[in-house]
Amino acid sequence: MRLYLVRHGIAVEGLKGGITRDSERPLTDEGREEMKLVAKALCKMNIKADLVLSSPLVRARQTAEYIAEAFGLDVKLTDALAPAVNHTQLFKSVARHEGAKEIFLVGHEPDMGMLVGNLIYAGL
């Protein structure tokens, strides 16, 4: 199995413009444009993605949608990629998708960086 870890694109800062919760913050115009380019570039890298798992927060979901669209896939939302979630929960969520060999995980910092550390430490 191959995991591709993606931190969401550039998001609107703070609570403004009618946004009342951090979970509602969308990507900025720059963030959307950047993620469109990233998704196109990923397609050129000979990645054979089977699955796109994403945090349910708006900015991560939007990022995942660009990637999924580029690969002709749907986005599966999982609370296991929400901020500050135990990585054991994420591993269980990934394991539920038995046939998937190449998976994009779209989440947040510092969680994605900590996940990389845990994967390296575990020798996965």
Residue ranges of model-derived segments:
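Active-site-proximal alpha-helix that buttresses catalytic centers in soluble enzyme cores
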Residues: 2-6, 10-85, 92
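Active-site-adjacent alpha-helix immediately C-terminal to a catalytic or transition-state-stabilizing loop
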Residues: 91-124
